[in-house]
Amino acid sequence: MMNSPRSLDSSDGSVDSSSVYSGTSSFGSSFTSSTGSGFTNSMLFDDEEAKKKKIRQMQNRQSAAQYRERKKEYLEKLETIVDNLESDRNQLLQQTKQLGMLQNENYLKINQLEEQIESALRENNDLKSRLSDLLSKQQPHDNSNSNSNSNNNSNVSPNNSINILNNNNSSSSNNNNNNSNSNNGGIGSFSNILNNNINNNISSSSPSTPSCSSPSFLEGRHFSHLQQQQQQQPQQQNSPQILQSPIPLQHSPLPIQQISPSSPNQNINRRSRFNIGESRERSILNPISIENVNNNNNNNIKLNGSGDMDTSSDNNSSMNINSINNSSNLNGFNGLSSPNQQPNSPSNRSQPKRQRDLFLQQQQQQQHSDPSSPNISSNNLLLLNNPNGGINSNNNSNSNNSNNSNNSNNIINNNNTSYTPPLASFTSILSIASSPSSSPVISSLAQLSSSPNYNSGGFSSFIDSNNNNSNNNNSGLENNSPSRRYKFHNGGINNISSGNLNSLKGIPK
């Protein structure tokens, strides 16, 4: 085709037919070749697209398969969860059924227990009614028994008990030893004497009266003393009575006004520290009060912290020793008088000589009879001696000298001390207080202070009716009254003053 213009140019514008034919033929051939190549290109494009579609389809299939597999897995998991939930639900249903059954059983048990409680209450009511019936039936028997016991107890009146004790004392007076003439008798065997007297009181009690483990030994002494006083009352009615005011007691020395009674037996000069043969009056100021010592042997004696000996009795009786008060008179203390009395008045004097002689004779007869069984006189343990020689008492006899409606004995004393002495030393001091001055009991006071039953520092101070002409002075007296001081090795007796209690000390050395 490149040569055709040259031919045209060369031929000066004339067209060569051969060249035109050749050009057309070349054009058709080129056209056919281009269309064939396009078809082949389209076929190739279609194949690629088909391949892509196939790949996409394969991917979709794979993803669907994976999805299905995942779905199956999820479904299986959900199925297991559902199965678990169903099993849990079934278990809960079973538990609810069991709880319902247990609730029903508990309800039945509660009903049974309520029935049992009701039956038990009914039985209790029945038993109460039976007991009330039995008690109502037994009350007449108890009343009859109590009446019989009261009759039996009423048979043991104070007079009868006095007679029993006096019979025992008269029977035992023939079996006593002669320790009254010896100088070391008395307190050396004081515990045996107390035991024998307690046994005498127990043996003299009535069979219908129950006995106690610790009987009151002051009781028998009191009853026997009452009978002795009944015998001596005709001789003592004309003797003057002493009304003495109480004086408070303290552990420390107190300034007490000393009044020395004028007695013919008091002008004896002491030639030794403790002369046994001197006939002088000794009385004791006892800080211990005895309350309600009854006529039976059922008294429980105890010493409280304030120095009082309280006795609580089991049975009622008509003979009591009343308490020692602060507002009543003090009988039997020769060295202490009321402020209204004179120091040398006749009412301030000691016991009559006839009373002392009778008392000493009775004690010597009881102690001389039997040396193997040492006993103490029933009057040795009396607390206080009145000026007539005995305790100020109202007996239960038919005499008209009764000053108290319930036949009680009024022992009056002032009690302000808080010390509580032992019982052994207390009873021994009581025996010394009621015994005469020439008794061998006084000679053994030193033995009392060293005895195992004696508590050192106890209350054991004598009031000595000494002569006013003595020249010894104590710091505890206001008016510088004469006195003498005795000391023992364990502190038994603190002070023996002329007519007064000078001081109460613990352990003098």
From Swiss-Prot:
SMART domains the UniProt entry points to: BRLZ
Cellular location(s): Nucleus
CC annotations in GO: nucleus
Ranges for region Disordered: 1-42, 134-185, 223-275, 290-414, 465-509
Keywords annotated in UniProt: DNA-binding, Nucleus, Transcription, Transcription regulation
All copies of domain bZIP, residue ranges: 50-113
Region (Basic motif): 51-77
Region (Leucine-zipper): 78-99
The keyword Magnesium appears for this protein: no
Gene Ontology molecular-function annotations: DNA binding; DNA-binding transcription factor activity
Compositionally biased tracts (Low complexity): 10-39, 226-248, 255-269, 292-350, 361-414, 465-483, 490-509
Physiological role: Probable transcriptional regulator.
Family: Belongs to the bZIP family.
Record-given protein name: Probable basic-leucine zipper transcription factor H
Species of the source: Dictyostelium discoideum (Social amoeba)
Gene: bzpH
